[in-house]
């Protein structure tokens, strides 16, 4: 404890004025012991010799304390206190009575003797009695102070005040006949308690030991001090610490006082338990927040628990864990923090071994047995981890310290996350040692898994290390088996290899990869001179059988290794160009193709990749050409390269003569014959298949096995073929000065090159025919659209089109199809225009359908629906009063190919809107005295009513409705009776009125029609 704080606490507790430095943050509180402290200052100093005849049950009080550091020196008795100290309560009571009686008697006797009067004697008795009473009062008033001094001196005699018992304190109180609640006695108890608490708390630079709470609680119970009084002493200590903190000017001193205060808060919280929340008002008195109190409790609890953990080593047992759990609960440490601290402690224990192992592993002067030392340290780690794992599954694990379980170096403030490479070295060392015997035991496999978790390695990282080390061990054992002949002598080599993998816990697929790698290395050694001899083939076969390598793996290895050599030869041959592919180059190709023992398919696949790469370069340059002629020239170079280089190289690879013509596929020949019969009129297509004389003149044809079919999209291949076809058809265009140009026609040999181009591009016969037909149709269509500009097909135009067809060479069916499409398109445009302009009705539509004109394709659905709506509108405005449901709902929608339900909705909407309009129109015509128009409008009203039956209609002037009915019923020709009755119902006219209107003369109509303009 800070010495200055001890000095301050050793001073008597008195209500001294507050320091100005503390008053601004400490609230004004009434001092708890002001009265008793005032009494302590009114002690009298009276010299009385100490009697040596004290009773045997009296507690002796020495003049010098044995332990002045805590409670100071013994206090001396002054004034009446030595006399009071000698008296027991009965003696003190008797003495008080004697003194009082003697005083009264003495006063009475003196007054009577001196004055001779009884009144004066009574007065003297009263005065003497008062004096005696004062003596008695002083004597009794000194008792609590004497008891307090006796208690102080008694406690000061002990070297360890904790030895004081509750019985000792009660004996002192009983001896003097005082109550423990007496202010002076209670003040002394509080002072003793305050001094003891101060002495128990750690001094400057020290930490809590963990026994402070037990000592304070024991001493508090021994003194019998009340909880509120004890809490007040803790608050007083806190005030003094705060005061000293304000008086301290140094930063270090301030920090130390802050730590001292946090220790006080923590110890106080444990001493008073749950009652500390209201017994210790830190926030109200010292402005300390609840969060700061929680931090003080948490940090000190962590410090104490950490100190307890230091006592636990790697030989931890059940008793240690139970004690740690009890300590955690007594320290008020949360389970989460306790778990973190325990894991950190176990991590530190393991780190010692890990660090030792790393230092050995990285030592430059490490001995040959360094690996064994490293493994020994790691075994200690695993042993400690297994101990914790077993304790975690203990039957009484719920009573153990929190955090018992497997260890991991990763987490919290550990720096091993940045030293992952070092941990990998340790793991590798352990795996290497586990496989040092040539096999991997089950217990080692489990230990490797645990070590991986402890070191915090990822599953992939650990697996990579294990596979690497196991692969080396597998290679070593495999080499021994091969060199010793054990593997070759086995009847079942697969079982032997499988057993080897099981002993090492090695994956069979990874073992197969090692076998493949060994085979590849052997193969590379055999082909160093560019070919495989018979001895090499035999050695490779022997190795393949011993290692059980599948044929597919062997073929893949040969294709890659031998193929790489062959590919280089092919590239050199191709790079020599058209002129450089001589006999020497052909010889090297033949040697590589057959000496490397490549299959024909593999060799052709390798050559195909290289050739197609060159073809692609030609195609790229052809696309980048400025015009069609330059593009065709690049394509011609590609055709020449295919004929002079690729064709020869393919023959060399196959071992055939290049002069031998390739065999034609009979199915393909049949397809070409069928196409010749169908499209023989196409001159451009016919020229691509020349006669024998021209074929012999052009020389041997090019190969068609290596094509660009899978390298270019269909659209690009067709465009390239079409480009060269147009070049063959139009010829070469040469520009001359003054803006003129000369077109040079090409001979039929260009069409043979076109045929070879089709083979290089991988176009089928059908695709080639479609290209030729498409160009012919395009040429014919362009000319035919000019001839049929107005869509009219006359006899002269037919003859003109026939002549054009012969020139183009387009077959008759195709020509007729083009002509029909042109005329149909022209007609569709004309029909659509007529519909939009309203010049086409349903009658004309039916005539067109009878003429086999497809209206569905010529007229859009929206236009057909528009035409239907116009037709229905004409019916509702025709003035006939007729509405044929079959015609409107079925026949017309069928003729126009529209939806029937949708047609019905259109009819209903029109009928409902035209119903009221027809009535308004009829009234308007009535006012204009247009009787004929009135009849027509009423017929339209009846037609709408037939489509959608209506309710009786209302009108403001009922006489006008009567006039409408009268005019309609008397119209000429006379309407049908059912129409008259329906109109009567719609106009809301009763039978009597209807009869009167029919019998009324024409001139007797109401004048409502004449006045209608004003009414309206």
From Swiss-Prot:
Localization: Plastid, Chloroplast inner membrane
Residues in compartment: Chloroplast intermembrane: 117-118, 281-368, 651-719
Segments of this protein annotated with the region Disordered: 654-708
Topology versus the membrane: Multi-pass membrane protein
Domain of life (superkingdom): Eukaryota
Keywords: Acetylation, Chloroplast, Membrane, Plastid, Plastid inner membrane, Protein transport, Transit peptide, Transmembrane, Transmembrane helix, Transport
Record's compositionally biased regions (Basic and acidic residues): 654-669, 684-699
Transmembrane residue ranges: 96-116, 119-139, 260-280, 369-386, 633-650, 720-736
A GO BP annotation: chloroplast organization
Entry GO terms, CC: chloroplast; chloroplast envelope; extracellular region; plastid; Tic complex; TOC-TIC supercomplex I
Biased composition (Acidic residues): 670-680
Main location: plastid
A Pfam family it matches: Tic110
List of residues that carry N-acetylserine: 52
General remark: The region 143-1016 is indicated to be located in the stroma while the homologous region in pea TIC110 contains probably 4 trans-membrane domains resulting in 2 regions in the intermembrane space localized to form supercomplexes with the TOC machinery and to receive the transit peptide of preproteins. Inserts into the inner envelope membrane from the stroma after import from the cytoplasm.
Subunit structure: Part of the Tic complex. Interacts with HSP70, HSP93 and TIC40. Interacts with the Toc complex components TOC33, TOC75 and TOC159. Interacts with LTD.
Comment block on domains: An internal domain (143-652) is sufficient for assembly into supercomplex with Toc complex.
Designated name of the protein: Protein TIC110, chloroplastic
């Amino acid at each position: 404890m800070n010495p200055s704080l001890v000095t301050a606490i050793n001073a008597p507790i008195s209500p001294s004025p507050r320091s100005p430095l503390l008053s601004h943050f400490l609230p004004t509180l009434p001092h708890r012991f002001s009265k008793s402290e005032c009494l302590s200052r009114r002690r009298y100093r009276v010299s009385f010799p100490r009697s040596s005849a004290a009773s045997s049950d009296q507690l002796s009080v020495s003049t010098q304390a044995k332990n002045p550091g805590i409670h100071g020196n013994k206090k001396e008795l002054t004034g009446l206190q030595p006399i009071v100290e000698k008296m027991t309560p009965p003696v003190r009571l008797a003495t008080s009575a004697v003194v009082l009686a003697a005083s009264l008697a003495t006063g009475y006797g003196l007054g009577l003797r001196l004055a001779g009067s009884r009144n004066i004697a009574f007065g003297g008795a009263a005065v003497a009695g008062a004096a005696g009473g004062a003596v008695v009062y002083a004597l009794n008033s000194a008792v609590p102070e004497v008891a307090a001094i006796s208690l102080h001196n008694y406690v000061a005699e002990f070297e360890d005040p904790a030895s004081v018992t509750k019985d000792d304190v009660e004996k002192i109180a009983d001896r003097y006949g005082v109550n423990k609640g007496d202010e002076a006695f209670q003040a002394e108890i509080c002072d003793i308690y305050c001094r003891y608490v101060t002495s128990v708390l750690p001094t400057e630079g020290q930490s809590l030991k963990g026994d402070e709470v037990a000592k304070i609680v024991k001493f508090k119970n021994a003194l019998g001090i009340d909880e509120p009084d004890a809490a007040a002493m803790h608050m007083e200590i806190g005030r003094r610490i705060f005061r000293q903190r304000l008086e301290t000017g140094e930063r270090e001193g301030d920090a130390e006082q802050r730590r001292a205060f946090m220790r006080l808060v923590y110890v106080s919280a444990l001493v008073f338990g749950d009652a500390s929340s209201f017994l210790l008002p830190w926030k109200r008195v010292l402005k300390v927040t609840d969060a700061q109190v929680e931090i003080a409790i948490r940090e000190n609890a962590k410090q104490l628990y950490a100190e307890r953990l230091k006592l636990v080593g790697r030989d931890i047992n059940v008793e240690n864990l139970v004690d740690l759990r009890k300590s955690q609960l007594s320290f008020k440490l949360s389970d989460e923090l306790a778990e973190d601290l325990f894991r950190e402690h176990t991590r530190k224990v393991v780190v010692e071994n890990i660090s030792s192992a790393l230092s050995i592993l990285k030592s430059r002067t490490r001995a040959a047995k360094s690996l064994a030392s490293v493994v020994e340290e790691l075994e200690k780690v695993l042993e400690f981890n297994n101990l914790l794992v077993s304790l975690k599954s203990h039957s009484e694990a719920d009573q153990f310290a929190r955090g018992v379980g497997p260890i991991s170096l990763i987490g919290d403030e550990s720096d091993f996350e940045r030293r992952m490479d070092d941990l990998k070295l340790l793991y590798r060392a352990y795996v290497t040692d586990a496989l040092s015997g040539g096999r991997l035991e089950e217990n080692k496999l489990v230990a490797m898994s645990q070590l991986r978790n402890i070191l915090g390695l990822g599953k992939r990282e650990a697996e990579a290390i294990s596979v690497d080390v196991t692969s080396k061990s597998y290679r070593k054992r495999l080499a021994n088996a091969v060199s010793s002949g054990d593997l070759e002598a086995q009847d079942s080599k697969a079982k032997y290899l499988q057993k080897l993998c099981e002993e090492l816990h090695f994956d069979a697929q990874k073992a197969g990869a090692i076998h493949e790698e060994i085979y590849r290395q052997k193969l590379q050694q055999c082909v160093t001179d560019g070919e495989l001899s018979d001895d090499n083939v035999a050695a490779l076969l022997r190795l393949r059988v011993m290692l059980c390598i599948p044929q597919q793996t062997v073929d893949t290895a040969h294709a890659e290794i031998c193929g790489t050599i062959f590919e280089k030869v092919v590239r050199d041959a191709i790079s020599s160009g058209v002129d450089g592919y001589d006999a020497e180059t052909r010889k090297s190709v033949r040697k590589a193709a057959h000496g490397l023992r490549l299959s024909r398919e593999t060799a052709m696949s390798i050559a195909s990749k290289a050739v197609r790469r060159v073809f692609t370069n030609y195609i790229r340059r052809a696309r980048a050409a400025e015009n069609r002629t330059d593009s065709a020239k690049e394509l011609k170079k590609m055709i020449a390269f295919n004929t002079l280089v690729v064709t020869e190289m393919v023959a060399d690879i196959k071992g055939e003569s290049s002069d031998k013509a390739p065999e034609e596929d009979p199915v393909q020949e049949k397809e070409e014959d069928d196409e010749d019969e169908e499209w023989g009129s196409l001159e451009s297509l016919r020229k691509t298949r020349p006669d024998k004389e021209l074929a012999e003149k052009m020389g041997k044809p090019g190969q068609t096995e290596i094509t660009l079919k899978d390298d270019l999209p269909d659209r690009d291949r067709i465009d390239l073929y079409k480009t060269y076809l147009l070049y063959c058809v139009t010829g070469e265009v040469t520009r001359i000065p003054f803006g003129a140009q000369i077109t040079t026609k090409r001979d039929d040999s260009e069409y043979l090159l076109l045929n070879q181009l089709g083979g290089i591009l991988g176009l089928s016969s059908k695709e080639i025919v479609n290209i030729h037909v498409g160009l012919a149709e395009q040429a014919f269509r362009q000319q035919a659209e000019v001839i049929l500009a107005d869509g009219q097909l006359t006899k002269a135009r037919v003859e003109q089109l026939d002549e054009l067809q012969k020139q183009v060479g387009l077959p008759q069916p195709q020509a007729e199809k083009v002509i029909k499409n042109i005329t149909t398109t022209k007609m569709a445009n004309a029909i659509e225009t007529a519909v939009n302009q309203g010049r086409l009705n349903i009658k004309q539509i039916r005539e067109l359908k009878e003429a086999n004109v497809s209206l569905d394709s010529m007229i859009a659905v929206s236009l057909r629906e528009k035409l239907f709506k116009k037709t229905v509108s004409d019916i509702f405005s025709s003035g006939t009063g007729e509405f044929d449901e079959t015609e409107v709902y079925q026949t017309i929608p069928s003729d126009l190919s529209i939806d029937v339900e949708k047609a019905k909705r259109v009819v209903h909407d029109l009928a409902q809107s035209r119903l009221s309009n027809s009535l308004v129109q009829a009234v308007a015509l009535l006012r204009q005295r247009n009787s004929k128009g009135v009849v027509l409008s009423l017929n339209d009203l009846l037609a709408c009513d037939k489509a959608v039956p209506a309710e009786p209609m209302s009108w403001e002037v009922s006489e006008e409705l009567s006039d409408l009915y009268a005019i309609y019923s008397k119209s000429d020709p006379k309407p049908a009776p059912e129409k008259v009755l329906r109109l009567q119902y719609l106009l809301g006219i009763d039978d009597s009125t209807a009869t009167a209107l029919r019998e009324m003369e024409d001139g007797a109509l109401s004048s409502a029609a004449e006045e209608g303009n004003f009414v309206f």
